[in-house]
Amino acid sequence: MAEEHEKGVPMVLAPQMGAIDATVESIRYRAQLIARNQKLDSGVAATGIIGFAAGFLFSLLMVIVLPVAVGL
């Protein structure tokens, strides 16, 4: 009688995992895209003020300092 409990229920059909695997891969791909985009946004936000200051100083150099130095 103990042998009957160890056998379990025989599987009639093999499980169809193709659709589940495709869905899991789709979710994994989307999660990676979201993570990449979030990292990019964080990097841009962290360096935005420095980039703005560098661009402003460069524009002052090009508009004011160089024409005065050249004599225009």
UniProtKB/Swiss-Prot annotation:
Reaction(s) catalysed by this chain's protein: 5-methyl-5,6,7,8-tetrahydromethanopterin + coenzyme M + 2 Na(+)(in) = 5,6,7,8-tetrahydromethanopterin + methyl-coenzyme M + 2 Na(+)(out)
Top-level taxonomy: Archaea, Methanobacteriati, Methanobacteriota, Stenosarchaea group, Methanomicrobia
Organism: Methanosarcina mazei (strain ATCC BAA-159 / DSM 3647 / Goe1 / Go1 / JCM 11833 / OCM 88) (Methanosarcina frisia)
Subunit structure: The complex is composed of 8 subunits; MtrA, MtrB, MtrC, MtrD, MtrE, MtrF, MtrG and MtrH.
GO biological process: one example: methylation
GO MF annotations, alphabetized: tetrahydromethanopterin S-methyltransferase activity
Subcellular location: Cell membrane
Family membership: Belongs to the MtrF family.
Keyword Transferase: yes
Protein name: Tetrahydromethanopterin S-methyltransferase subunit F
Alphabetic keyword roster: Cell membrane, Membrane, Methanogenesis, Methyltransferase, One-carbon metabolism, Transferase, Translocase, Transmembrane, Transmembrane helix
Membrane topology according to the record: Single-pass membrane protein
Matches recorded under InterPro entries: MeTrfase_F, MeTrfase_F_su
Superkingdom of origin: Archaea
Membrane-spanning segments: 49-69
Function: Part of a complex that catalyzes the formation of methyl-coenzyme M and tetrahydromethanopterin from coenzyme M and methyl-tetrahydromethanopterin. This is an energy-conserving, sodium-ion translocating step.
Pathway(s) this gene product operates in, as recorded in its UniProt entry: One-carbon metabolism; methanogenesis from CO(2); methyl-coenzyme M from 5,10-methylene-5,6,7,8-tetrahydromethanopterin: step 2/2
EC identifiers of the protein: 7.2.1.4
Enzyme class: translocase
Gene Ontology cellular component terms for the protein in this record: plasma membrane
